[in-house]
Amino acid sequence: MTFQTFKRFVLMSVFFMTTSVVIYAQQSTMQGLIGQSLAKLQQPTSESILNCIAEMKRIDDMFPDSIQPKFQIALQSLNYSVMNPHAPQTENLLKETEETIAKMENIKHADPSDICTLRGFLYMVRIVQNPGQNGQRYYLEVMQDYEKALKLNPDNQLAKQLQQKFFEGMKQQTGKPVNKKQRLFYPRTISPEPKKRVAT
């Protein structure tokens, strides 16, 4: 190995090491900002959730290639919407959530289980907005999205909690529990198992 080649090799090694350190530092900064914002939701109110959404959007602007800010924007928008299904801001938040989910679907390292969970939650909010009109329209979508989310990632706690809430809500509406046979009756397409999730 000549001196010039060796020098080039060292410079490239230093470059990649520096890049890795910068990326790690950026991820740590992003995680810290997200954590600070979510810490304000210990006792969530409509106002605090809206503030959290605004903060997450700013974080997303700072880290446009990251999934987590987008996930939190969608999740907190849905949390607000399910608490305030007929508030003036709700419809715009739901439209933005649809757009955010679409963006996440186009990012390679996005977790498909998380995407299914958010989509199921979105349809569930639509049912809460108008049970009579949207119940039959979105019922199957909610069921299938939560089941697919859990098929892709059985440890998805958010999907488990939302699915349970959905079953409880349907039981209250109909007076009958949604049993396993009913759930298995509905056709569903399961995507291939995802690769191990990479932190972003």
What are these regions (language model features)?
Residues 1-33:
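Bacterial Sec-dependent N-terminal signal peptides
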Residues 21-48, 56:
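Short glycine/proline- and aromatic-enriched beta-strand/turn motifs that initiate or cap beta-hairpins
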Residues 27-40, 62-84, 109-130, 156-171, ...:
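Amphipathic alpha-helical repeat scaffolds of TPR domains
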Residues 42-56, 89-100, 135-141, 178-179:
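Helix-turn-helix repeat elements of alpha-solenoid scaffolds
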Residues 51-62, 69:
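N-terminal segments that cap or nucleate solenoid repeat domains
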Residues 62, 107-108, 152, 189-192:
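Structural marker of alpha-solenoid helical repeat scaffolds
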Residues 92, 99-148:
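Alpha-helical adaptor scaffolds
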Residues 137-150, 157, 168, 173-195:
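TPR/TPR-like (Sel1-like) alpha-helical repeat modules
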